[in-house]
């Protein structure tokens, strides 16, 4: 062999970057060992996986939130990182929810220095609103997160991705195993772009595990853990079916708007939100679709059991699923061939070569607040505290032909229709209709909708009239006092800054 290499060097002068052949296993040493060849990705513990990943202080770690309120990966991994002495990390989870309150101590102790997320709720949201972090949290939409990753601003060093099961080479999906969560649309983006991908799995299955949402050629390391998530808690939080008469009234009115909008025809497409009223619209649309002999071409989302029901009844031909919102959706993804998993890039990224939200006819979304310019707040409560998520709100509002916001006029003694929202997440230019329990308002820029709805005999109000009625019922709210300190920056889906969130003054 040495003689052959020497002869080759005499016959051919190697340019810079080229080296002579040195043997089958010279650059693939694992091929020399049968066990190493097949099991080189498997780690005996989470600590081993972290050490092998090459993670260092100051780097960026990422997670997905497909398990929502049942997620166990974020807290498990960050606790281990703290135990191992890591500091100044950037945490980039596709979203954070109530269950992630243990991060508070890790932020205080310097383990986490910066956060990118779509949502903040519960104790974590309260503490960050009170000034917990030195660096403002970066709030992004689901599509906007992909844009930040693709632009290089958000560069993921190590992605820790929880999956119900996988094979020893890393082929994984979210709709198999005892803890199935459904679509891994968020995780697929991280698996594609992270420098190192670590899978945390509950179960091993035989190779090859297909269909694979995350493929073997994307995975560096795998570690088995006891639990990655509780599938029973996927529906916790913002996702809820309703029997509330007020919300059902709003849903019924929203379905009427869809029916007479001009978009309700054979082959239309739709997405429903996760709030009580916006989710309930699906019930009322079913009757109208049957009565008019209409079948939808596709449903997009965030797929829920109500959408699955319409699909299995033949009323929606295809479901495009970037996140499964309940067990029925996870089951359907495994069983129904026309229930298709898509990545968040395909779902809603403005940098995508083809985002499905741009094919939407109708989207129904909820809101914490909406103002007289149709701007929508889904991030902060009436007290100015972080308690929501940007989600796909601005993405789908921008892409859909018809964006309907469903919200009560007031919640308790708090107006939902206001002069100016506390936090602008979705700009009014992409919002078309507001449906409340006291009336319907159409964005004046959509004269076509105004004409269609009036022709159908649907009474309309101006949004200013709704705002004044809300104020009459609740009184004029006392303005919230904020300090100058910015605790969060709201990024629009294209990466631009659309608003900032400041520390509430009495939270010092």
Curated annotation (Swiss-Prot):
Catalytic activity: citrate = oxaloacetate + acetate; citrate + acetyl-CoA = (3S)-citryl-CoA + acetate
Single GO molecular function: citrate CoA-transferase activity
InterPro entries noted in UniProt: Citrate_lyase_asu, NagB/RpiA_transferase-like
EC number(s) per entry: 4.1.3.6, 2.8.3.10
UniProt keyword annotation of Iron present: no
Domain of life: Bacteria
Keyword annotations of the record: Cytoplasm, Lyase, Transferase
A Pfam family hit: CitF
GO terms for cellular component: ATP-independent citrate lyase complex; cytoplasm
The keyword Amino-acid biosynthesis belongs to this UniProt entry's keyword annotation: no
Record localization: Cytoplasm
Gene3D superfamilies the record matches: Glutaconate Coenzyme A-transferase
Alphabetical GO biological process terms: acetyl-CoA metabolic process
General function of this protein: Represents a citrate:acetyl-ACP transferase.
Quaternary structure and partners: Oligomer with a subunit composition of (alpha,beta,gamma)6.
This protein's name: Citrate lyase alpha chain
Organismal lineage: Bacteria, Pseudomonadati, Pseudomonadota, Gammaproteobacteria, Enterobacterales
């Amino acid at each position: 062999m040495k003689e052959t290499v020497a002869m080759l060097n005499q016959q051919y002068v190697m340019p810079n970057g080229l080296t002579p052949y040195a043997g089958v296993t010279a650059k693939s040493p694992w091929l020399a060992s049968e066990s190493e060849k097949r099991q080189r990705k498997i780690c005996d513990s989470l600590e081993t996986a972290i050490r092998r990943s090459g993670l260092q202080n100051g780097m960026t770690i990422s997670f997905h939130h497909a398990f929502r309120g049942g997620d166990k990966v974020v807290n498990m991994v960050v606790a281990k990182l703290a135990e191992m002495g890591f500091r100044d990390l950037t945490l980039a989870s596709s979203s954070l929810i109530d269950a992630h309150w243990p991060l508070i101590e890790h932020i205080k102790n310097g383990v986490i220095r910066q956060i990118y997320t779509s949502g903040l709720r519960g104790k974590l949201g309260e503490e960050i609103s009170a000034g917990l972090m030195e660096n403002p949290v970066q709030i992004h939409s689901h599509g906007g997160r992909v844009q930040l990753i693709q632009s290089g601003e958000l560069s993921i060093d190590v992605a820790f991705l929880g999956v119900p099961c996988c094979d020893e080479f890393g082929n994984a999906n979210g709709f198999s195993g005892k803890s199935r969560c459904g679509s891994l649309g968020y995780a697929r983006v991280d698996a594609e772009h992270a420098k190192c991908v670590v899978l945390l799995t509950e179960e091993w299955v035989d190779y090859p595990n297909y269909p694979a949402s995350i493929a073997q050629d994307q995975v560096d390391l795998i570690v088995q853990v006891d639990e990655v998530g509780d599938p029973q808690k996927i529906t916790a939080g913002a996702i809820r079916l309703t029997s509330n008469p007020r919300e059902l009234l709003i849903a019924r009115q929203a379905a009427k708007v869809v029916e007479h909008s001009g978009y309700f025809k054979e082959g239309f497409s739709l997405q429903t939100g996760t709030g009580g009223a916006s989710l309930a619209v699906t019930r009322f649309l079913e009757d109208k679709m049957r009565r008019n002999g209409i079948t939808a071409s596709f449903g997009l989302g965030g797929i829920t059991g109500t959408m699955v029901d319409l699909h299995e009844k033949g009323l929606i031909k295809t479901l495009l699923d970037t996140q499964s919102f309940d067990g029925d959706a996870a089951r359907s993804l495994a069983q129904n061939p026309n229930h298709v998993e898509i990545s968040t890039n395909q779902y809603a990224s403005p940098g995508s070569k083809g985002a499905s939200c741009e094919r939407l006819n109708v989207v129904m979304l909820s809101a914490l607040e909406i103002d007289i310019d149709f701007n929508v707040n889904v991030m902060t409560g009436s007290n100015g505290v972080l308690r929501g998520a940007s989600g796909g709100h601005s993405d789908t509002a921008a892409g859909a032909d018809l964006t309907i916001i469903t919200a009560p006029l007031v919640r308790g003694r708090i107006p939902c229709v206001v002069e100016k929202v506390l936090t602008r997440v979705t700009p009014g230019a992409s919002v078309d209709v507001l449906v409340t329990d006291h009336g319907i308002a159409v964005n004046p820029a959509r004269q076509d909708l105004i004409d269609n709805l009036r022709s159908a005999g649907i009474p309309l109000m101006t949004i200013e009239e709704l705002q004044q009625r809300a104020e009459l019922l609740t009184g004029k709210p006392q303005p919230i006092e904020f300090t100058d300190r910015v605790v969060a920056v709201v990024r629009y889906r294209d990466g631009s800054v659309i608003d900032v969130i400041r520390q509430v003054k009495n939270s010092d």
